[in-house]
Amino acid sequence: MKKITAALILIALVFGAVSVGAQARRDGFYFAEGKEFSRSGWKYQAVIEVKGGKIVKAEWNGINNLGQPDKKTQAAAGVYRMNAPQGEWHVQAARVEAELIRLQDPTKFVVKADAKTDAISGVSITIKEFTDLAVQALASAPVAKGMYKKDGWFYFKSPTFDNSGFASTALITVVNGTIVSANWNAVHRAGGDSKFVRAVKGAYKMNAKQGEWHVQAPRVEAELVKLQDPAKLSVKSDGKTDAISGVSITIAEFKTVAAEALKAAR
C-alpha cells in the first residue's frame, strides 16, 4: 500500500511539474524590468515571446536615468560606446538573446561570479541582469494585448526648455501593444546631470511634502501605465493634477512628451 501511495505521489509530482512548465511556456509576450537604476544609470528590461510553447524571440534592453533613449538605440548610434573587440553593447546583447532562444531556459545560462560568461562566443558584457530578468519574465503572466500597433522603445525630448532650463523627456516601453514601462525625465540646457539625478543627489530640491521630484515622477509614470493613454491623464489649467495621489509637481509636460513619443507606436 505504501509503495502504491508513493508511486501515486511521484506521478502527481511529475504531472504537476509538467503543468507548471506548460503554464510558464504559454504563448504570449513576457516582460520584466529591474527594480532600480544601476550605478551607471541603467535599468534593464527583458521581453520574451513564446509561440507554440517555445521561446521564439528575446529582447534585452535598458532604460536610463539620464533622460536619453534606450541602450540599444544609443549603442547602435555610437553614443554609448565600449570599444570592445567583441563589438558594441547592442551587438553582444543580440548574441545573448540568441543563446536564450537556443537554450530555451534562462536557468541554463552559465554565469560566473563576476556576472559574465565564457559560454557564449563574442560576449564580454555582464549578462546576469538579463538572465535574472528572463527568469522573472517567464514566471509572470503574459502581457495582455494593448491598443498600440507597434512594440518597442519610444523616446521624445521636448524641443523647448522651460524657465528653469529643463526640457522634458519620455521613454515609453510597449510590449504586445501595451505600455509596460514609462520613464519621465528632463535634461538641462547647460548639460550635466538630468533632473532625476539632480533630485536624487539633492541638487534639485523642492522640499515638497509629497517627496522630491524623483519620488513623485514614478507615481506619474505608474499612472500612465495604468491608464495606457497620456490623453487620459487629468491635468488642470496650472499643469498639475488632483488625480494622482502624492503628486504635487506639474505633469503637463510629461503628458505632452509621452503623447509625442507614442505617436510612432500608434
Indicate where each model-derived feature is located:
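Positively charged n-region of N-terminal signal peptides that target proteins for export
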Residues: 1-8
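Active-site- and interface-proximal helix/loop "cap" or "latch" segments in soluble metabolic
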Residues: 24-150, 157-266
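Bacterial N-terminal signal peptides
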Residues: 8-16
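Sec/Tat signal peptide C-region and signal peptidase I cleavage site
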Residues: 18-23
